[in-house]
Amino acid sequence: MSEIKIGIIGWGSLLWDPRDLKISKTKIGNCSQDIWHGGPYLPIEFARVSNDGRLTLVIDEGINTDIQSSKSQTWIAESLLSSVEDARFDLSIREGGEGVPTGHVGITSRNESGINMLIKEWLDGPENTEKFTDLIWTNLEPQSNEPGEKWEYGDRCKYIQSNMENKKLIEYIKKTPPTVRTPIRDYAEKEFGWKQDESYIWDRIAKTIYFPKS
């Protein structure tokens, strides 16, 4: 494959709220929809408190916490940009600004480890190499609302309990794709009945997911 094709890995609000992110669309009915294709399984968890108080999903390998890391399927949209540098900048702007860190793995990448290795192994799959030359993703770390404090399973559960009035927090957890199963999500569903908001269409045969535009 000589043509550069860049895939953007998403797992949270990027899927239902891409804003001005430059990604390919597909015509479904009378609407133009952002289509996300099945991506690699990665250890993601509700582990980062955002500026508006949501408990958002980030890559979390469970290091230095009591949370057992588990892998969930992520999703990939094709960037309309043909430069990895431009696509990473575009993703950073969507995620809050130029300084937001992003990760990158390409078909020519070598000696990867950790998360990069998991993504590279997926990219090296025969059917995936035909689709993409490069993959990028938001590379934010777990972060509590109080820097330096412990941030284990119980702490995150208490954070949710203390912020029940935050509608954005509740909406985020409910809208997260059904393929994301984590200890924190299980807790929210069992404790508060926050079931999956089925505002998406998941085509299991085509291995795609999209959120219809209103």
Where on the chain are the PLM-derived regions?
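A glycine-rich, hydrophobic/aromatic-adjacent loop/helix-cap motif
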Residues: 2-214
